């Protein structure tokens, strides 16, 4: 039985965490509080430890095979989002960005365009460009929403006009790489917004690939007026779309990565074109860990989500007290907070370096997230009350 009376976020001290050797705890000196990378300060969930321990005890450390991953995701998705994905359309792959890369290789060719909606997860840029694809930006609005006019202009640029233009030579292949829920802003796209995206994509012949890794971290059921997560493949018009899911973000399994890609009915053949070799690097222990998380993790995840809601409220209150010039972007998902510091630092000052030097807090540099990121910082809320309080109080030195 899992004790949910104490949030997983409040079980480890700073001394406990500094025993870790992951990038979060080794990238900076010990006098810096690391609040930059999306890694949580929680002990590993007992059901994950048990699943991995059982596998190790019997030597179940061979190659992965089958649909174990998707079979565990299906009932989880039914419980959390009232959605029943089709496990038979799935492909288990080493992690989300490997899955995205393999899908881009199938759907596009070098020189084709990938549309992104910045500010957005930085690897969307790196992986896309490493494959020789062009990045076309369709920035979110100042409120962090998808903008149909901006998207349509990006689709037109990406496709050379697309099927909607009727121009000779138009209709180059293109993909929209959608982050849903959105990192770093915490935006949860509404069903209506997703329907609009799919309608525009259909008109311009743009394929939609969604990274839905942050889906378990929406909190509409815990707050007033929040937006619930809508799986892309549950929306009309998603027949040719592909969505990628992983438990690694919600259950802190970045060191045991795995993912599953799911296809709409018209994209099944495309997903099957992903080479078999792409799945050879799937970590069988990771699949077992993720399957255990999806199967046994509801109570643990709910306690964690409640802690994130509490921490978001705490950070908002403390920032207003200690750094009132910093504006907090409202969020409905993820465990990240997007901070607008444009009025808090003098012109010409690098906010990331300024905070690191004066406050000894490492935050995510907004410039890494593409258009609209300059003058912003990303704060990780997935830590204890004590550490979060100390970090925000330190930020008061910088702002």
Where are these regions (language model features)?
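N-terminal small-domain helix-loop-helix segment of the aminotransferase-like
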Residues: 2-96, 102, 293-295
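Conserved core of the PLP fold type I
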Residues: 57-199, 216-235
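Hydrophobic residues in well-ordered beta-strands that form the structural core
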Residues: 116, 137, 210, 363-365
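Helix C-cap/helix->beta junction micro-motif
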Residues: 131, 203-204, 239, 359
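Conserved core segment of the aminotransferase class I/II
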Residues: 237-309, 399
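Conserved glycine-rich beta-strand-loop-beta hairpin in the small C-terminal domain of fold type I
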Residues: 291, 308-316, 328-341
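PLP-dependent enzyme catalytic core of the Aspartate aminotransferase-like
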Residues: 354-363, 369-399
């Amino acid at each position: 039985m899992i004790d949910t009376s104490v949030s997983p976020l409040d079980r480890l001290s700073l001394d406990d965490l500094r025993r870790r050797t992951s990038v979060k705890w080794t990238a900076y000196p010990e006098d810096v509080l690391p609040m930059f990378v999306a890694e949580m300060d929680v002990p590993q969930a007992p059901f994950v430890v048990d699943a991995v321990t059982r596998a190790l005890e019997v030597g179940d450390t061979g190659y992965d095979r089958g649909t174990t991953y998707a079979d565990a995701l299906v009932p989880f998705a039914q419980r959390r989002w009232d959605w029943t994905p089709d496990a038979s359309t799935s492909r288990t792959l080493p992690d989300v960005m490997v899955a995205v890369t393999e899908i881009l290789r199938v759907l596009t060719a070098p020189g084709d365009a990938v549309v992104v909606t910045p500010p957005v997860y930085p690897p969307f840029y790196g992986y896309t460009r490493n494959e020789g694809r062009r990045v076309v930006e369709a920035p979110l609005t100042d409120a962090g929403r998808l903008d149909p006019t901006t998207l349509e202009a990006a689709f037109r640029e990406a496709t050379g006009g697309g099927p909607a233009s009727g121009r000779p030579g138009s209709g180059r292949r293109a993909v929209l790489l959608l982050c849903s829920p959105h990192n770093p802003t915490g935006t949860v796209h509404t069903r209506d917004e997703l329907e609009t995206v799919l309608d525009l994509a259909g008109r311009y012949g743009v394929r939609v690939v969604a990274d839905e890794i942050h889906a378990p971290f929406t909190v509409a059921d815990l707050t007033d007026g929040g937006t619930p997560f809508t799986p892309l493949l549950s929306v009309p018009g998603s027949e040719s779309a592909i969505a990628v899911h992983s438990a690694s973000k919600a259950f802190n399994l970045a060191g045991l990565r795995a993912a599953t890609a799911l296809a709409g009915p018209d994209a099944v053949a495309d997903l099957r074109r992903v080479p078999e070799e792409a799945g050879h690097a799937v970590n069988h222990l990771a699949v077992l860990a993720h399957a255990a998380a999806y199967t046994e993790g509801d109570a643990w995840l709910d306690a964690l989500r409640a802690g994130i809601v509490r921490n978001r409220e705490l950070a908002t209150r403390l920032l207003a007290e200690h750094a009132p010039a910093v504006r907090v972007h409202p969020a409905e998902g993820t465990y990240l907070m997007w901070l607008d510091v444009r009025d808090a630092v003098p012109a010409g000052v690098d906010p990331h370096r300024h905070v690191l030097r004066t406050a000894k807090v490492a935050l995510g540099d907004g410039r890494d997230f593409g258009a609209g990121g300059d003058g912003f910082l990303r704060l990780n809320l997935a830590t204890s009350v004590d550490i979060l309080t100390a970090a925000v109080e330190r930020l008061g030195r910088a702002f």
